[in-house]
Swiss-Prot record:
Residues 620-639 have a biased composition (Basic and acidic residues). It is a single-pass type I membrane protein. Keywords: ATP-binding, Cell membrane, Developmental protein, Glycoprotein, Kinase, Membrane, Nucleotide-binding, Receptor, Serine/threonine-protein kinase, Signal, Transferase, Transmembrane, Transmembrane helix. It is found in: Cell membrane. The active site is at D440 (proton acceptor). Residues 306-603 form the Protein kinase domain. It catalyses: L-threonyl-[receptor-protein] + ATP = O-phospho-L-threonyl-[receptor-protein] + ADP + H(+); L-seryl-[receptor-protein] + ATP = O-phospho-L-seryl-[receptor-protein] + ADP + H(+). This is Cell surface receptor daf-4. Residues 48-253 are extracellular. Glycans are attached at N60, N134, N165. Residues 275-744 are cytoplasmic. Disruption phenotype: RNAi-mediated knockdown disrupts tail tip morphogenesis resulting in retention of the pointed larval tail tip in adult males (also known as the Lep phenotype). It comes from Caenorhabditis elegans. PROSITE patterns: PROTEIN_KINASE_DOM, PROTEIN_KINASE_ST.
C-alpha cells in the first residue's frame, strides 16, 4: 500500500471508531410507560374479542344460537403518515345475514389495522358439536353448518390472541354456550377447508369450562416485553453504524476517483506538451491546446466580449442571437449565442459537458459546430458557438430547392459528423475518443456552412457513452417526436451502445429523406414543397399517434416517382432506407452509411455537373457499393480534416460550379431580429424536454403497467366502490395489490 492509501486508511479508522463508540447500544430496561401501554393494548383487544363472542353467543328459549354480525373494523387510512397500515384479505360470512336476506355465499374482504391495534388477522367463530365424536385426531375439520361468523379482527400481539398460525385457522379458545374461535395471520387462512377445532372427545370439559381472556398480561408477557426493546435497539444501532460506514467508504472512494482523474489530466498535459514539441521539431502545424480555463462555468456574474446582439430565433426555453465576439487577440468573429433560462440548466450542463470532452482532443472536427465558450451570465446560461449565415438545414430546405451536387455535399458532411460522434476511432480523426449519442438529430440541429458543408449542433440532449459506467439516463424518452426511432416510441431500447447509436442513425435517415426530397434532378424537375417527415399525420403528433404510424403500421416517408426512377439518386434512397429499418439491429451504422455514400458520390465521373442523368453516370451497381465497407481514396478527406478551414476545400464535387448553384445565404433579418417567414410557413414541431424516467408499476387486476399517479387514482376509485357496496368480486380472489398501498 502506498503512502496515500495508508493516510486514507488511518483517516477512515479515526472517523469510524468514535462513531462506533457513540452508537454502541446500552441495555435498557422497560419503562413504566412501556409496561402500561402493553397492558392497555392487550386489554383493548381482548375486550373487542369478548364483545364479539357475547354478540354471537346468545341463548333463546329453545337453546339454539342467535347470531349477530361481528363488529367489523372500519376500513380507513391512517391520518398520520408515520403509522403503518397493514392489510389482510379474509373469508367473510355472517349467519344472521344468511338467515335474513338469504345471501349465504362465502365472499372475501380486505381489512386494515387501525388505531393502537397494529396488526390484523383472519377470524372464525363456530359452534362446537354437542355429540361425542369417535375420533382420536387432536384437531377436526369444522363443517359449514357450524359456521357462525367468518371475518377479520385487529390485535396488538399475535401470541396473546393465538394468531400465530399462518397456514390454517386452528381453535385456540372456547367459550360458554358451545362456541369456539380461531385466529390466523395470512391471507385467506380462514377458508372453510382450513378451519380446525379441538376434538371434544379428547377434552370433555371444554363445554363446561369457560376459558375467558384475562384483563391483564401475565408475568411472562411482561418479562418478554422487558427483553424486546433491547434486541431491537441492537439491530437499529448496528444498521445505523453500517449506513454511516458505507457513506464514509463511498466518500473516500469518490475522493480517490477525483484524485485519479486529476493525475490522468496531468499526465495528458505532459503528453500533449511532448507531442507539441515533437510536431514543432518536425516542421508540422502545431497542435491546438484545449482552452479549458475559458469554458469553465462560474456562479458569479461575469462579462464576455460579445456585442451587437441580433435575435435569430426564440422558443419556450431560450433565445438564439447572432453577435460579434472580440477575444483578447482583437480578431473579431461572428458567433451564435444561445441563452437558456434556469429551467434549461440541465440542458446547458449536458451541452457543456460534450463540448468539454471534444475540446480535450488535439483538433476540432469540422463536421461538428465549433465551440467558443460556455458561461453563466446573471441568471442566464450562455453557449457560444460559431455562426453560419445559412442557418439550419431546415431553413435552407424549406425556402429553396438544391442541386444534386449540393445534396451530395450536404449528405456526405452530415453523415461524416455522425460517424465521428459515434465511433471510438473515426475515419479521419486519428485519435481514439468516447462514443457520443446525440439523441436529437433533425434538420434544425444541422447547420449549413457557406461552402454547403454541414455541421451538427445542439448537444443539449447528448450523452457520452462510457462502457464501464451504467448510465440509466440514456433510457429516457427524449428528442423530437417525429424523429424518434421505433424502439424509442415503443419504450423497448436495449442498454447497449449499438442500440443507442441506431436511434441516431434512424433520425439521420429521415434528414436524408428531407434533403433528397428537395433535390432538383434535372432541368425540368419540379420538387414538391418542403414537408417535414410524417407531416401527413399532423404538425404536432402525439407519441401514441407516432407509435401507431411508425411502429404498428411500419410507415415511412414516401418517395416521389422521380427519385425511384433516377439511377443515381436511387442508391442514396437505398442507403436511407437501410438507415431507417424498423429493426435497430438491422440498420447500418453511421460509418457504413458514410462509406457507401462516399464511394457512390466520388465514383461518378460527372459528379461536378449540376444535374445527373442515368447516361452520364458510371455504371456501378448497388451490390458493388455494398461490398465496400470502408471509403476508398480517402486521402483528400484526411487532408481536409487535418488542415485549417480556409486552406483546403471539401473533397466532394463543388456545387458552386453547377449550372444550378446553391442559393445565397439567408440575410432576411427584421429590425426586431426575427427571421422573416413566408405566409404559409408550417408551425414548428414541439420538442420533448429531457424528462426523468417514469416509474411503471404492474397492476395484476388489469394486467397493465401504470404510473404511480395513475395507480393511486385507480386505487382510490376502487376503495370508494368498495365502501359503497359496489364490490362485485364475490367468490374470486382479490388480486394482490388491489387495495391498500401499491409498491414497486
Amino acid at each position: 500500500m502506498n503512502q496515500k492509501g495508508t493516510v486514507r486508511l488511518k483517516a477512515l479508522v479515526l472517523i469510524c471508531l468514535p462513531l462506533f463508540l457513540i452508537a454502541t447500544p446500552v441495555p435498557v430496561a422497560v419503562t413504566e410507560d412501556d409496561r402500561q401501554d402493553r397492558i392497555e393494548s392487550e386489554a383493548a383487544e381482548k375486550e373487542w374479542a369478548n364483545t364479539l363472542v357475547s354478540k354471537v353467543a346468545q341463548s333463546n328459549g329453545t337453546g339454539t344460537i342467535k347470531v349477530s354480525a361481528p363488529a367489523k373494523p372500519t376500513l380507513r387510512r391512517m391520518d398520520n403518515e408515520e403509522d403503518e397500515v397493514i392489510s389482510i384479505e379474509c373469508v367473510y360470512y355472517d349467519e344472521m345475514e344468511c338467515e335474513k336476506s338469504g345471501d349465504c355465499e362465502i365472499t372475501k374482504k380486505t381489512c386494515y389495522s387501525e388505531a393502537h391495534l397494529k396488526a390484523v388477522g383472519c377470524l372464525a367463530v363456530f359452534g362446537l358439536p354437542t355429540q361425542e365424536i369417535n375420533s382420536t385426531e387432536p384437531y377436526l375439520k369444522v363443517d359449514k353448518p357450524q359456521y357462525k361468523s367468518l371475518g377479520c379482527m385487529p390485535y396488538q400481539h399475535a401470541d396473546s390472541m393465538n394468531c400465530e398460525n399462518e397456514s390454517s385457522c386452528r381453535q385456540g379458545r372456547s367459550f360458554r354456550g358451545g362456541i369456539g374461535m380461531c385466529c390466523c395471520s395470512t391471507n385467506n387462512c380462514n377458508m372453510p377447508d382450513l378451519i380446525e377445532m379441538v376434538n371434544p372427545s379428547l377434552k370433555k370439559d371444554s363445554d363446561n369450562s369457560a376459558l375467558l381472556w384475562a384483563s391483564t398480561p401475565s408475568n411472562m408477557d411482561l418479562e418478554s416485553l422487558d427483553k424486546f426493546p433491547f434486541y431491537w435497539i441492537i439491530i437499529i444501532a448496528l444498521s445505523v453504524i453500517l449506513c454511516i460506514a458505507l457513506l464514509i467508504l463511498a466518500y473516500v472512494g469518490w475522493k480517490f476517483q477525483q484524485n485519479k482523474k486529476e493525475e490522468i489530466k496531468k499526465q495528458q498535459k505532459i503528453k500533449f506538451d511532448m507531442e507539441k514539441t515533437d510536431a514543432l521539431e518536425a516542421g508540422n502545424v502545431p497542435l491546438v491546446e484545449p482552452e479549458e480555463e475559458m469554458i469553465e462555468m462560474v456562479e458569479t456574474p461575469k462579462e464576455l466580449p460579445i456585442t451587437d446582439f441580433q435575435l435569430i430565433s426564440k422558443g419556450r426555453f431560450g433565445k438564439v442571437f447572432k453577435a460579434q465576439y472580440t477575444p483578447d487577440s482583437g480578431e473579431k468573429r461572428l458567433v451564435a449565442v444561445k441563452k437558456l433560462n434556469e429551467f434549461q440548466k440541465a440542458s446547458f450542463l449536458a451541452e457543456k459537458r460534450i463540448f468539454d470532452e471534444l475540446n480535450e482532443y488535439p483538433k476540432w472536427y469540422k463536421s461538428i459546430v465549433e465551440f467558443v465558450c460556455a458561461e453563466k451570465i446573471g441568471d442566464e446560461y450562455w453557449i457560444v458557438t460559431e455562426f453560419h449565415e445559412r442557418l439550419s438545414l431546415y431553413e435552407l430546405l424549406k425556402n429553396n430547392v438544391i442541386s444534386i451536387t449540393s445534396a451530395n455535399r450536404i449528405i456526405m458532411s452530415m453523415i461524416d459528423g455522425l460517424q465521428f460522434l459515434h465511433d471510438d476511432r473515426p475515419y479521419f480523426f486519428g485519435h481514439p475518443k468516447k462514443p457520443i449519442i446525440h439523441r436529437d438529430i433533425k434538420s434544425k440541429n444541422i447547420l449549413v456552412k457557406s461552402d454547403m458543408t454541414t455541421c451538427i449542433a445542439d448537444f443539449g440532449l447528448a450523452r457520452i457513452y462510457s462502457y464501464d459506467i451504467e448510465q440509466s439516463d440514456l433510457l429516457g424518452q427524449v428528442g423530437t417526436k417525429r424523429y424518434m426511432s421505433p424502439e424509442m416510441l415503443e419504450g423497448a431500447t436495449e442498454f447497449t451502445p449499438t442500440a443507442f447509436k441506431a436511434m441516431d442513425v434512424y433520425s439521420m435517415g429521415l434528414v436524408m429523406w428531407e434533403v433528397i426530397s428537395r433535390t432538383k434532378l434535372h432541368q425540368t424537375d419540379e420538387p414538391p414543397n418542403y414537408q417535414m417527415p410524417f407531416q401527413v399525420i399532423g404538425f404536432d403528433p402525439t407519441i401514441g399517434l407516432m407509435r401507431n404510424y411508425v411502429v404498428s403500421k411500419k410507415e415511412r416517408p414516401q418517395w416521389r416517382d422521380e427519385i425511384i426512377k433516377h439511377e443515381y439518386m436511387s442508391l442514396l434512397k437505398k442507403v436511407t432506407e437501410e438507415m431507417w429499418d424498423p429493426e435497430a439491429c438491422a440498420r447500418i451504422t453511421a460509418g457504413c452509411a458514410f462509406a457507401r455514400v462516399w464511394n457512390h458520390i466520388m465514383s461518378s465521373p460527372d459528379s461536378s455537373e449540376g444535374y445527373h442523368s442515368g447516361s452520364s453516370m458510371k455504371n456501378r451497381g448497388v451490390d458493388d457499393v455494398e461490398q465496400s465497407e470502408k471509403p476508398e481514396g480517402i486521402e483528400e478527406m484526411q487532408h481536409y480534416h487535418a488542415s485549417s478551414p480556409s486552406k483546403r476545400q471539401h473533397p466532394s464535387p463543388n456545387p458552386f460550379f453547377d449550372s444550378c448553384p446553391p442559393p445565397p445565404p439567408i440575410p432576411v433579418i427584421l429590425e426586431n431580429g426575427g427571421i422573416l417567414q413566408p405566409d404559409n410557413a408550417e408551425p414548428e414541431p414541439e420538442e420533448l424536454p429531457d424528462l426523468p424516467i417514469v416509474e411503471k408499476i404492474y397492476d395484476i387486476a388489469t394486467n397493465m403497467l401504470f404510473s404511480r399517479e395513475e395507480l393511486d387514482l385507480m386505487n382510490a376509485q376502487r376503495q370508494v366502490e368498495y365502501e359503497a357496496g359496489a364490490d362485485t368480486r364475490a367468490s374470486t380472489p382479490t388480486p394482490s395489490g388491489t387495495f391498500g398501498t401499491f409498491t414497486t
